[in-house]
């Protein structure tokens, strides 16, 4: 029985100085400090359980998300958890439809990142009270209960509530076997850890060599800053991994539409499976034009990590603008909105390959994609989940990768809880790590 009245909501600005090592660097984000607005929900329940929620940021600006979380707090405080999850669609709409706050959205930007952090904490607490990892909580729900968590506003022209229920009902066949498959073998992953744009060749070679030894067969390279440098780096990686392994490329929104087509035509010799975020995440028709132009070269378009909401995904699918759909556990409105996108992707038969990495993104999105395989898509064809090998040591329940696959979490919750000492030391600007760095910069 889900219970307890929310008695406290706190939010922390947690930042890791990843820019010092070039980790996470790409053509648009050259010096990111991987960060998070970290939400903690407490209730008056005797079990003492807490819910932890995250939304991912790149350093500066995290304080703005923290402000937005605090602005949403009145919609959460003193609410009964059982009533929240009993009408989760209504609660989602309450958060996203505040008559004043929605003006700085609606359902996009900073206020939506804050919504994700709050809702992620609610889902974590719900799963903990049920004693299940989040993926299992979702898998065990009947179709009608799952669908009741989704706000279908603005997407009923593509997916109705009844259609969503029918998709889930049809996927009941073979669920038990697929769950056993996940528990035994895990969900296939690819690595982005080897080829950040800021890495020198020596680092790239070393990390690529280590990844091959560890059994990785799918690799992603950052591109978009300099064509000749991209050609050199892609040739280096392709030569190292060989012709049979899978290579993807990611431009992180660097190009205009004609530039994307021209650039990728020149990189086609390296046989990339996809080009990720070739242009503005808001340009649906631009993505469609790029997708059409690159199809004869065998290159698909992948996007989604900075798509604001389910409506953008709806239009990308309608316009046939992408071959691979990339959900993000913190950009959309938490599990609720991601459920709607997974179901739309199933209807359009587009594979979902989630965005991960960051602070806690791997920990969160593993639950969604494992659920997707068991209860929605029922397929691993052309599907894989991103993995980045850093910052997991700061989480109480870090991801487990075995033979280049995500192994299903067994601990109750959404895997969002960070270690207290890590939060304390990396809190900005008063944590020990930042006091030292800011002091050194001041000198």
Curated annotation (Swiss-Prot):
Phosphoserine modifications at: 148
Needed cofactors: Mg(2+)
Catalytic residues of the enzyme: 222 (proton donor/acceptor), 355
Species this chain originates from: Bos taurus
EC numbers on record: 4.2.1.68
Signal peptide positions on this chain: none
Substrates-to-products reaction catalysed: L-fuconate = 2-dehydro-3-deoxy-L-fuconate + H2O
Gene giving rise to this polypeptide: ENOSF1
Family classification: Belongs to the mandelate racemase/muconate lactonizing enzyme family. ENOSF1 subfamily.
Keywords for the protein's UniProt record, in alphabetical order: Isomerase, Lyase, Magnesium, Metal-binding, Mitochondrion, Phosphoprotein, Ubl conjugation
Biological role: Plays a role in the catabolism of L-fucose, a sugar that is part of the carbohydrates that are attached to cellular glycoproteins. Catalyzes the dehydration of L-fuconate to 2-keto-3-deoxy-L-fuconate by the abstraction of the 2-proton to generate an enediolate intermediate that is stabilized by the magnesium ion. May down-regulate thymidylate synthase activity, possibly already at the RNA level, by promoting the degradation of TYMS mRNA via an antisense RNA-based mechanism.
Gene Ontology CC entries for this record: mitochondrion
Enzyme class: lyase
Record protein name field: Mitochondrial enolase superfamily member 1
Post-translational modification: Could be sumoylated.
The keyword DNA-binding belongs to this UniProt entry's keyword annotation: no
GO molecular function: hydro-lyase activity; isomerase activity; L-fuconate dehydratase activity; magnesium ion binding
Annotated residues for binding of substrate: 24-26, 34, 220, 252, 276, 305, 355-357, 386
Binding note for cofactor: Binds 1 Mg(2+) ion per subunit.
Record InterPro entries: Enolase-like_C_sf, Enolase-like_N, Enolase_C-like, L-fuconate_dehydratase, Mandel_Rmase/mucon_lact_enz_CS, Mandelate_racemase_C, Mandelate_racemase_N_dom, RHMD-like
Binding site for Mg(2+): 250, 276, 305
Pfam annotation, one family: MR_MLE_N
GO biological process, one term: carbohydrate catabolic process
């Amino acid at each position: 029985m889900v219970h307890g009245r929310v008695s406290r909501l706190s939010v922390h600005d947690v930042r890791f100085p990843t820019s010092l090592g070039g980790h996470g660097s790409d053509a648009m984000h050259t010096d990111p400090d991987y960060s998070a607005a970290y939400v903690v929900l407490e209730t008056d329940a005797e079990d003492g359980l807490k819910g932890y929620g995250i939304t991912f940021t790149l350093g500066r600006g995290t304080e703005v998300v923290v402000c937005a979380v605090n602005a949403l707090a009145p919609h959460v405080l003193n609410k009964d958890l059982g009533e929240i999850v009993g009408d989760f669609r209504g609660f989602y709409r309450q958060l996203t439809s505040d008559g004043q706050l929605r003006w700085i959205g609606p359902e996009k930007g900073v206020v939506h990142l804050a919504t994700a952090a709050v809702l992620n904490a609610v889902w974590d607490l719900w799963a903990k009270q049920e004693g299940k990892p989040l993926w299992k909580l979702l898998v065990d729900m009947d179709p009608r209960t799952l669908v009741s968590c989704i706000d279908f506003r603005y997407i009923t022209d593509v997916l109705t509530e009844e259609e969503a229920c029918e998709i889930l009902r049809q996927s009941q066949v073979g669920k038990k076997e697929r769950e056993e498959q996940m528990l035994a073998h895990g969900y296939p992953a690819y690595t982005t850890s080897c080829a950040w744009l800021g890495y020198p060749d020596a680092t790239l070679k070393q990390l690529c060599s280590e990844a091959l030894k560890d059994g990785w067969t799918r690799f992603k390279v950052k591109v978009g800053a300099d064509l000749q440098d991209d050609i050199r780096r892609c040739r280096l990686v392709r030569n190292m991994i060989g012709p049979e392994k899978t290579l993807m490329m990611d431009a992180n929104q660097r190009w205009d539409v004609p530039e994307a087509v021209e650039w990728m035509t020149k990189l086609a010799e390296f046989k990339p499976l996809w080009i990720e975020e070739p242009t503005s995440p808001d340009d649906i028709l631009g993505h469609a034009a790029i997708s059409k132009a690159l199809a004869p070269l065998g290159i698909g378009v992948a996007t989604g990590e900075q798509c604001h909401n389910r409506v953008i995904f709806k239009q990308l699918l309608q316009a046939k603008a992408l071959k691979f759909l990339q959900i993000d556990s913190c950009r959309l409105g938490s599990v609720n909105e991601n459920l709607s996108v997974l179901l739309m992707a199933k209807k359009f038969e587009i594979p979902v390959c989630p965005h991960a990495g960051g602070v806690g993104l791997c920990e969160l999105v593993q639950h969604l994609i494992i659920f997707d395989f068991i209860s929605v898509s029922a397929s691993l064809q052309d599907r894989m989940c991103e993995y980045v090998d850093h910052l997991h040591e700061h989480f109480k329940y870090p991801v487990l990768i075995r033979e280049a696959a995500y192994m299903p979490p067994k601990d109750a919750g959404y895997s969002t809880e960070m270690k207290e000492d890590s939060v304390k030391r990396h809190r900005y600007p008063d944590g020990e790590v930042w006091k030292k760095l800011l002091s050194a910069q001041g000198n």
